[in-house]
């Protein structure tokens, strides 16, 4: 795969010829990276979504009403290598170019607090606003 030609943010279903290679580069999953501690892994994921929401507020981007499937591929240091998404049918209508630009900007600045041995991935759905006000903020920052 040509690193330069392949986008780091794309719609799920696009570039399907590269999925096997991307998955090989990120063989672990979020849960195993956090020693199969479901609560801790969930708080890390929720913390990332809260950071996404905060980033949207910082740049004055209205993400509220957006509902989508996310597949995020992380480097071992927690930086986002690839992010693919697909809007849910009940999502607020947002142009793909706009949400792609948002995710590209977020991926440049975000780093999950983790020290993994290998790349890892997580696939889940997300809705904004998150309503994760009760997550343990200390866990999310660890």
Question: Language-model segments: what does each one mean?
Answer:
Residues 1-142:
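Charge-biased low-complexity segments
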């Amino acid at each position: 795969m040509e690193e330069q030609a392949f986008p780091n943010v794309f719609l799920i279903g696009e570039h399907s010829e590269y999925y096997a290679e991307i998955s090989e580069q990120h063989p672990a999953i979020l849960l195993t990276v956090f020693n199969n501690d479901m609560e801790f892994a969930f708080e890390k994921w929720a913390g990332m979504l809260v950071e996404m929401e905060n980033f949207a507020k910082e740049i004055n981007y209205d993400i509220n009403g957006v509902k989508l499937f996310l597949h995020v591929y992380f480097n071992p240091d927690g930086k986002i290598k690839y992010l693919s998404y697909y809007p849910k049918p009940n999502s607020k209508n947002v142009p793909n170019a706009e949400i792609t630009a948002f995710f590209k900007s977020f991926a440049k600045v975000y780093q999950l607090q983790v020290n993994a041995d290998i790349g890892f991935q997580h696939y889940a759905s997300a809705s904004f606003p998150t309503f994760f006000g009760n997550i343990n903020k200390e866990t999310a920052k660890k």
